[in-house]
Amino acid sequence: MALPVAGCALLAACSRSGPEINDAGYEVNTAYVATGQDSRVRFIVLHYTSENNEDSLRILTKNRVSSHYLLTDGQEPVLYRLVDENRRAWHAGSSQWYGYKNLNAMSVGIEIVNKGPLNPEKTLWESYSSRQIDILAALLKDLAQRHRIHPRNIVGHSDIAPQRKIDPGPLFPWEALARQGIGRWYNKNRVRQHEAMFRSTGLPDIFWFQEKLRHIGYEVAFGANNEEQTRKVLQAFQMHYRPQRYDGEPDIQTAAILMDLAGQP
């Protein structure tokens, strides 16, 4: 008797999603849904706006540039959804991550109201509020779960466009988010072991750094003539994983963190 009941239940479910007449005037039957599908979203890209709340909203809603979400600042930050996740927002520009290019088509962009650098030398930065980060963490967890996004694919604009972008900056709390299971981070014990090894063996050459950076997702060209490009990529990497010093120079701690991340699955 169970089979007829299941059959009736299935037919009832189908009858709820029968033919629909859309605005264009033709009929679409949505009774069946294919199992062979997944989300178009592979990446989450984080930005700061460099503007106040009012200007951020105006720029992101009245111009070509846009983002899926905008998180304001103040005592009670507001999370706005400006673009549906199923549609493309124009936030990433020329970009690359793990060989994927022009990430607008496959990412969710999140803009956070924050001034970024407070001086021309970019040595002073505005911090993010704890309330902003609490809201952001909840959003990131939800997005990552719904779209099945790998931790390594939650990135900053500077990670995917290191030659021209520096947001979300060195004060963005990547490590604190990683402790909540959001994003990629390194193992400190292994990094200390790698540091001891490099103190004994010496620092690897520029080709080693280029290869490891490419291995963990960054776009960087091989060759001794690409030192300035490599320096900017290293600076983006350091802002993300070693924000206490982000001069773009290769050093033992940077090498140790790179080595650990490159060994992660």
Show which residues each predicted segment covers:
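Bacterial N-terminal signal peptides that target proteins for export
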Residues: 1-3
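C-terminal motif of bacterial Sec signal peptides marking the signal peptidase cleavage site
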Residues: 11-13
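Active-site-adjacent loop/helix surface patches within enzyme catalytic domains
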Residues: 18-37, 42-152
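Second-shell loop/turn segments in exported
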Residues: 32, 57, 96-99, 120-131, ...
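Acidic, His- and aromatic-enriched active-site or binding-groove loops in soluble protein domains
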Residues: 36, 70-71, 170-193
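Extracytoplasmic/secreted proteins, especially bacterial periplasmic and envelope-associated proteins
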Residues: 64-65, 74, 131-142, 172, ...
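Acidic/histidine-rich, metal-coordinating catalytic segments
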Residues: 149-164
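Short acidic, glycine/serine/threonine-rich helix-capping segments at coil-helix boundaries
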Residues: 197-261
